[in-house]
Design a protein with these regions (language model features):
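Glycine-rich phosphate-binding loop plus the immediately following alpha-helix
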Residues: 121-177
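Glycine-rich phosphate-binding loops at beta-strand->alpha-helix junctions
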Residues: 64-72, 220-249, 264
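Short glycine-rich, Thr/Ser-proximal phosphate-binding strand/loop in the N-terminal lobe
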Residues: 3-42, 49, 123-124
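Short beta-strand-loop/turn "lid" adjacent to the catalytic site in phosphate-handling enzymes
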Residues: 35-36, 51-86, 122-126
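Adenine-nucleotide phosphate-binding core of ATP-dependent small-molecule kinases
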Residues: 178, 183-229, 260
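Glycine-rich phosphate-binding/hydrolytic loop that grips phosphoryl groups
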Residues: 91-97, 137-141, 248, 255-280
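Short glycine-aspartate micro-motif
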Residues: 6-12, 59-63, 101-107, 129, ...
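Conserved phosphate-binding catalytic cores of ATP/NTP-utilizing and phosphoryl-transfer enzymes
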Residues: 1-4, 72, 77-106, 111, ...
Length: 280
């Protein structure tokens, strides 16, 4: 199917963002992300832009994953569409980006999916997940703060102090408990009051979402004995603030996750690479 090109093309049609990549070997040679309007239209726009960047090389097939893939038919802009299971794409993509053959991928998109992947992603297990993710962050932000822009929310959170809205372990018991230090969160938003600034609430939202994901990811890693191979991916992981909170949270459990470059393209990369991985 792919004999005419050394390039692999993958799309991830998400609820908010449509992403696409061109892969050569295991490296990204071109990428693009745009807001998802109508899934088929957004996919076509990304595909056209990527194809225009490599006019000299023929690409006949596009691998598609994400929730919007069900809106596509058997072809797109004259290219054969191969639909890839999203969990398989997350597994393959996470391992590819991290340069690992096995690992636990915590993929933070609108919600969060957790996948244990082995043998470069040929074998995967759905470890679980949570509805808490980037969508939670933006939804609560819009309701509580009137902010819908992720960039604006992150900037506000950096100016705020989560401890002004969160109750810490030290606040309750006066010190650490077990593996949990005194400054760790005991209850998210327990202290929120009229005196809390918009920036403090923004910081608290980041804390809550990223701590929930970090704890769930750490527990899954221990359950699957993949503590040394945890990979965090997805659009939310690209945020410096979110990634720092996730790393700090997982460190409580002795886990140092890898957050690879281009982590936001995990599913698109996995879709593209599946055209090779699942045939070998």
């Amino acid at each position: 199917m792919m004999k005419n090109s050394s390039l692999l093309l993958g799309l991830d049609i998400g609820a908010y963002i449509t992403k696409g990549v061109l892969i050569k070997g295991s490296s990204i040679v071109a990428s693009l992300s745009i807001p998802t309007d109508k899934p088929a239209a957004s996919a076509s726009n990304v595909l056209k832009s990527l194809l225009d960047s490599v006019k000299e090389e023929k690409v006949t097939t596009v691998a598609v994953s994400g929730g919007g893939k069900r809106r596509l038919g058997e072809s797109l802009l004259g290219k054969t569409v191969v639909k890839v299971d999203e969990l398989q794409a997350i597994g393959i993509g996470g391992l590819t980006l991290a340069g690992k053959s096995q690992g636990l991928i915590v993929n933070m998109g609108t919600g969060t999916a957790i996948v244990a992947a082995y043998d470069e992603g040929r074998r995967i297990t759905h470890a679980g997940g949570t509805g808490v993710g980037g969508g939670t962050l933006l939804g609560l932000s819009e309701r509580m703060l009137g902010i819908r822009s992720f960039e604006e929310l992150e900037a506000a959170a950096r100016r705020g102090r989560a401890e002004r809205v969160d109750l810490t372990v030290g606040d309750i018991v006066g010190g650490p408990v077990g593996i949990v230090p005194a400054e760790a969160t005991a209850s998210n938003f327990e202290r929120i009051g009229a005196e809390a600034s918009k920036e403090d609430v923004a910081a608290g939202l980041f804390n809550m979402v990223c701590q929930v994901v970090g704890v769930l990811g750490a527990m899954a890693a221990k359950a699957y004995r993949l503590e040394d191979d945890v990979i965090v991916s997805g659009g939310l992981a690209k945020s410096p603030l979110a990634s720092s909170i996730i790393k700090e949270t997982m460190s409580l459990f002795g886990i140092s996750p890898v957050i690879p470059e281009n982590c936001e393209y995990c599913t698109a990369v996995g879709a593209a690479r599946s055209l090779r991985i699942l045939k070998s």
